């Protein structure tokens, strides 16, 4: 599987948030960006991961970092997910999976013992110059947010 490497310039993007407002990577680079890709809103692993990142929101802020989740869901799905789970992370819509492809976070993965094409749970730490500082691929949701925080 092809992966992005630490030291590379992070691929730029422009995606809509839960309110339908377009946000680019450049818009976020006033802080470090923790960009995490997840398969689907309101599913067990994705909910756990989003809640964990939200619970650590103030700790990420102390480290001058903003947390941004990306999935193929639409704005309405993100709004519902944010509301139901009291999330305080930014969620972006990558409905055509173009950004996931740029970050090598879309491809073959195992699901219930079978190979499927889908989002590969991945997280990237991007510095204020837009350079990848850390790349995590095929992560487990449980405990991941804490691991990312400790990597900052």
UniProtKB/Swiss-Prot annotation:
Active-site residues, as the UniProt record annotates them: 46
Protein name: Putative peroxiredoxin bcp
GO CC aspect terms: cytoplasm
GO terms for biological process, alphabetical: cell redox homeostasis; cellular response to oxidative stress
Pfam families reported in the protein's UniProt record: AhpC-TSA (PF00578)
Cystine connections: 46-85
Self-association and partners: Monomer.
Gene3D superfamilies in UniProt: Glutaredoxin
Entry-linked PROSITE patterns: THIOREDOXIN_2
PANTHER family xref list: AHPC_TSA FAMILY PROTEIN (PTHR42801:SF4), THIOREDOXIN-DEPENDENT PEROXIDE REDUCTASE (PTHR42801)
Thioredoxin domain ranges (all copies): 4-152
Highest taxon in the source lineage: Bacteria
Family the UniProt entry places it in: Belongs to the peroxiredoxin family. BCP/PrxQ subfamily.
Catalytic activity annotation: a hydroperoxide + [thioredoxin]-dithiol = an alcohol + [thioredoxin]-disulfide + H2O
Native source organism of the sequence: Helicobacter pylori (strain J99 / ATCC 700824) (Campylobacter pylori J99)
GO molecular function: thioredoxin peroxidase activity
The enzyme's E.C. designation: 1.11.1.24
Protein's job: Thiol-specific peroxidase that catalyzes the reduction of hydrogen peroxide and organic hydroperoxides to water and alcohols, respectively. Plays a role in cell protection against oxidative stress by detoxifying peroxides and as sensor of hydrogen peroxide-mediated signaling events.
Keyword terms of this UniProt record: Antioxidant, Disulfide bond, Oxidoreductase, Peroxidase, Redox-active center
Keyword Oxidoreductase attached: yes
Keyword Disulfide bond recorded: yes
Extra remark: The active site is a conserved redox-active cysteine residue, the peroxidatic cysteine (C(P)), which makes the nucleophilic attack on the peroxide substrate. The peroxide oxidizes the C(P)-SH to cysteine sulfenic acid (C(P)-SOH), which then reacts with another cysteine residue, the resolving cysteine (C(R)), to form a disulfide bridge. The disulfide is subsequently reduced by an appropriate electron donor to complete the catalytic cycle. In this atypical 2-Cys peroxiredoxin, C(R) is present in the same subunit to form an intramolecular disulfide.
